[in-house]
Amino acid sequence: MLSFSHVFDAPLEQVWSVVGTVDRVDWVPGVAACDLQAGVRTLNLPGAGEIQERIIERDEENYFLRYQCIESPIPLEFHEARMQLTRESPNQCCLTWEAEIQPASFESFLQESMSGALAQLITVVEAEASK
């Protein structure tokens, strides 16, 4: 299992407004567009195809999101991820992002993708905080 965490110098609600809006993709590198239909988001990756992810759980009160890849241009057997935000203080929160993937040979690819997305998420949240 892959696991990342990051403490944001931003209110929990501000970070949730980005990651909890499941069709918002400005923080996901390589994704040009997202279409959300009946709990399934389709991510368009120019030059790579489309990825479909089923939103399994989105808990607005506990700031928790769980999703599973159901269609991918790479031959995945299983991919599920969880994002949890916890309040550290009124103006700080911690994001914990965990993911499982099979076959395990794709783990390094997923780790690189998640690292890039986390870096972009930090940039987006910081830009919104400075508005």
Model features per residue range: what roles?
Residues 12-13, 56-62, 85-94:
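A short, structured loop/turn motif at beta-sheet edges
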Residues 1-5, 40, 50, 78-80, ...:
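Intrinsic-disorder/low-complexity, polar/charged segments enriched in Ser/Thr/Lys/Arg/Asp/Glu/Gln
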Residues 15-19, 25, 41, 55, ...:
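Hydrophobic pocket/interface hotspot
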Residues 39-46, 71:
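Short aromatic-glycine motifs in intrinsically disordered, low-complexity regions
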Residues 62-70:
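Short, solvent-exposed secondary-structure boundary/capping segments
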